[in-house]
Every structure is written in C-alpha cells, then in structure tokens.
C-alpha cells in the first residue's frame, strides 16, 4: 500500500499488464488476511496507516488532481476503518487506547482529513462506548456477508 500511495501523485499514466508477478495461495489458517491473525498483527496495520497519513498532503494536490485526491482519501479512510474495526475486535483496553491514539494522530497531522474521515464509514467504525463497539462489529459482520471477505 505504501509503495503506491506516496508516489501516486507524481504518476502521469498507469499501465495495466496482465502478467503474474506474484502467486498467493489463499486459504491457509496462518494467512495475514485471516481475521484472528489481523487482530494479532494490528500493530503492523497501524504502522502502515500512519505512514500513509504522513506520506501525502491530500489538500496540497492541485485542483487538477481532485479525482486522485478523492481516491487517496477513500483509500486512507478505508485503512482507518480497518484499523478501527480490528482494534475494536481485540477488545482490550490497550487496543481502545491505540484506536484513540490513531485518530488523534490523524487529527494532529491534518484536521481537514480527520474531519472528513470522521464523517465517513471510517468514523462510523470509531463510535464510542460499549454500544458503539457493538454497532461497529455488527456493521463489520454485515459488510462481511455482503462483500464476502475474510
């Protein structure tokens, strides 16, 4: 994710090449996309999300790149949602502290992106309190059934 996020604003054209560069066997229990593995490795997810927050000032992109800005914002928002959901799944007080720290990190870095993100699906994954956590997990499981992930 980081390898394309930072240089993307500098790209003029993208080309699709229909070749296998990497083969990935899906279905192993210890796979990184396995839900329980993601919860255990949430620190890696947080590290990548913070790198993406730092990588590009979305509002410094020229008006001619507003579609790129929207795409990059949506991707960052998705990363915030994923991090928030897996930290909520963890359920430990330290995990909730990490979630608060992540959102504060985004706010300190760029308040405009924070405000927009907190009023998106990612913000809905950051609802406070026990009821908010239950709603977040319920929404995750509904999305899981609709989009067939994990």
Language-model features: where?
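Amphipathic alpha-helical repeat scaffolds of TPR domains
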Residues: 70-86
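C-terminal, non-catalytic tails of nucleotide-sugar-dependent glycosyltransferases
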Residues: 44-71, 112-116
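Hydrophobic core segments within long, regular secondary-structure runs in both alpha-
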Residues: 42, 46-53, 99-107
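Secondary-structure edge/capping motif, primarily at the C-terminal ends of alpha-helices
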Residues: 28, 56-63, 86-91
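Short, charged, amphipathic alpha-helical segments
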Residues: 66-74, 96-100
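Membrane-interface aromatic/basic loop that binds lipid-linked glycans or pyrophosphate carriers
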Residues: 89-150
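Nucleotide-sugar-dependent glycosyltransferase catalytic core
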Residues: 4, 10-48, 90-97
